[in-house]
């Protein structure tokens, strides 16, 4: 007497997934803007005195008096200066601190 199996033979229930490859004409472009760091820009204003702006740059960013004065003069003469750079979170925090000190500041991606 032959042995009868009551179970069906093993069948792979999962169909083989098709191999998906990108077409040769597809080119993935990297958004270079996403690779650039963020910068904090301080803008000239008619309210804050130059020595106060210099003091704030020293206090918030640890700049020497000479470097803080140089940045302050750039704000005064060119209308703006980049005073810090880094991650978005860091720059957002720097902008908040500058606003708390009464300075006009914004953030943007580094343009260089």
UniProtKB/Swiss-Prot annotation:
GO biological process, one term: protein catabolic process
Top-level taxon of origin: Bacteria
SUPFAM superfamilies: ClpS-like (SSF54736)
Chain segments annotated as coiled-coil in the UniProt record: none
One Pfam family cited in the UniProt record for this chain: ClpS
UniProt cross-references to Gene3D superfamilies, sorted A to Z: 3.30.1390.10
InterPro entries assigned to the protein according to its UniProt record, in alphabetical order: ClpS, ClpS_core, Ribosomal_bL12_C/ClpS-like
Job of this protein: Involved in the modulation of the specificity of the ClpAP-mediated ATP-dependent protein degradation.
Family in the record: Belongs to the ClpS family.
Subunit structure: Binds to the N-terminal domain of the chaperone ClpA.
HAMAP family on file: ClpS
Protein name per UniProt: ATP-dependent Clp protease adapter protein ClpS
Organism: Rhodococcus opacus (strain B4)
Source lineage: Bacteria, Bacillati, Actinomycetota, Actinomycetes, Mycobacteriales
Gene coding for it: clpS
